[in-house]
Amino acid sequence: MRDGVGQDVIERLGSRDLNDDGEIINLAIVGSSRYYDYSNFESLIDSWIEMNGYPDLIIVGGASGVDYMAERWAVNNTIPVAIFSEEWDDPRRGLEDRGRPEAPNSLTEKILKSSSHILAMPSATSKWTRVVIKEAKERRIPIEIHELE
């Protein structure tokens, strides 16, 4: 369900206007690893596209929940996806959270450096996603936030 190791995909595709619309959109999608409502996820990303344009590349951290649904959405829509699974000690992924430890700081930095836009979907228990939100705001990376219940 992926195009390759995250950093390799970024280096190969990250600076290209893959859909020839005149704009490069490298959309990082981050959010709760315990959120599994694909229908709502799809509505949120469709709404984002209406406002911002079609992404050339989807960037995810390789966790469960929102990250996994973003991978699935990218594949279903024939959009390349960069998955930073190399940042995890336990690279096994799936839709449901299996209690893997929090993401390393290096993952946060790679996602922020690679993205032109961020779509964040945190829940009340999201820690890492809130770090990404804070850093994106400080760096003035365009970000849209949808709080999940």
Regions found by a protein language model. Give the residues of each.
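Acidic/glycine-enriched connector segments
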Residues: 2-26, 33-149
